[in-house]
Amino acid sequence: VSDNPFDPSQWQSVDGFDLTDITYHRHVVDGVRQPTVRVAFDRPEVRNAFRPHTVDELYRVLDHARMSSDVGVVLLTGNGPSPKDGGWAFCSGGDQRIRGRSGYQYASGETAETVDPARAGRLHILEVQRLIRFMPKPVICLVNGWAAGGGHSLHAVCDLTLASREHAKFKQTDADVGSFDGGYGSAYLAKQVGQKFAREIFFLGRPYTAEQMHAMGAVNAVVDHAELETVALQWASEINGKSPQAIRMLKYAFNLTDDGLVGQQLFAGEATRLAYMTDEAVEGRDAFLEKRDPDWSSFPRYF
């Protein structure tokens, strides 16, 4: 019996995408599309390390999920196992073979010799972090193997994390390769596990099991590997059974105090949308269009 948590019979590829480094699926039950999508790194032979092209695809599909009004939850994971050694990985961070002095470089192949010198290096995995953070729907990270370096930071920025009991390994390798995630990957991680554990994770760069990360507070649940995506779909189903507006407001409320004016703007934007839905707001709009004074007399000043 396969222990691969991915069951292709439950998923359907999302049309309109020509992807090489990422897969993008919609959950289906009896042929009916469900409000959960699955986004996965698809470079298992290199522990799902990302290159600029990978990040381009990842951003595109996540943004599509963000703008799909019938999608409520995003699952983010990595495909596997590796065809080389059978190992599992969620994401092992940036592909160091094509890292240049200005960031990760576009390349036609897999090595430094194939880098395109005319294109600037990129660090746009940080844009993906912000997209996950600002997306008005929960993103659940499924750590089915290694979450290292930039992959560790991606797990940290997701709303929830489920981890494989047998194969999940967490390791923050940034300082080993002269890199550092000075934003969500570190400071927000410290909000989850506390300052002492966060500094240990970064300063020592040791590997941690799913159980250890759960004890620290960075993993929501430790799940048998073969059941990882089944459990994730159950969590997604429970979330999708809640009010979409409430889920949006809750995510932005949790984010607000750490995200400054941007966090305030996102929360306030959803509050504005709620206001637009009221009779009071309709009266204000109609009075403007009809060139008359608004009549607020029927609207109480609540306290």
Regions found by a protein language model. Give the residues of each.
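Glycine- (often His-adjacent) and acidic-residue-rich active-site loop
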Residues: 14, 46, 78-128, 178
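Short loop-to-helix capping motifs
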Residues: 43-44, 242, 291
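Crotonase-fold acyl-CoA enzyme core
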Residues: 130-244, 278, 286
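Short acidic/histidine-centered micro-motifs embedded in hydrophobic/aromatic stretches
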Residues: 204, 216, 249-256, 287, ...
